[in-house]
Amino acid sequence: VIFLMLAATIVVLGALGISFLRKSMNKNIATYEETMNDGYNLEIKSEIQSAIAIIQTYYERSQAGELTEEEAKELAKEVIRGMRYRDDDSGYMWIDDTDYNLVMHPILPEQEGNNRYDLTDQNGVKIIQNIMKSADAGGGYNEFYFTKADGVTVAPKRAYSEKFEPWNWVVTTGNYIDDMTEEI
């Protein structure tokens, strides 16, 4: 009888210990995921702010008479087109204007000039309309589904956008959520 009571106590204590460890581990994973997500948010916001600063430099050069506005815009677009971030250089930025026209996209140059007002993801999310709302609010994050660089895979993406007022440009970048969770 004592042996059975001792065995039962050990089993109960073991189960409690395992339960505690599992809860602790889940809490640590959730904290890590939150930290990683905060890091991604900070990364994409920082990249956009860097791009806006570069665009601002070209704008100032046009205002000073060093470049025409068109020359400044073309140079700014080409610099932003070449900008990459992330270890694998998968991070890039694109520019829409406030009339919803694609100004520059390094992966989809054939779509430049197209109006994207009605661009909608598979869940009915109006991608560019939401991006514009965030940019109009001083900058912000959006989530939507978009085709990956392979041209086939559609995956959820988290993006950050800000507006460059003098040229009515909205600069955006984002990361695919599944790429972020793979790292976690």
Q: Where would I find each of the regions flagged by the language model?
A:
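Extreme N-terminal signal-anchor transmembrane helix of membrane signaling/transducer proteins, especially
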Residues: 1-24
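Juxtamembrane membrane-water interface segments immediately C-terminal to a transmembrane helix
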Residues: 19-52, 63, 67-70, 74
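Amphipathic coiled-coil signal-relay and dimerization helices
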Residues: 101-107, 154
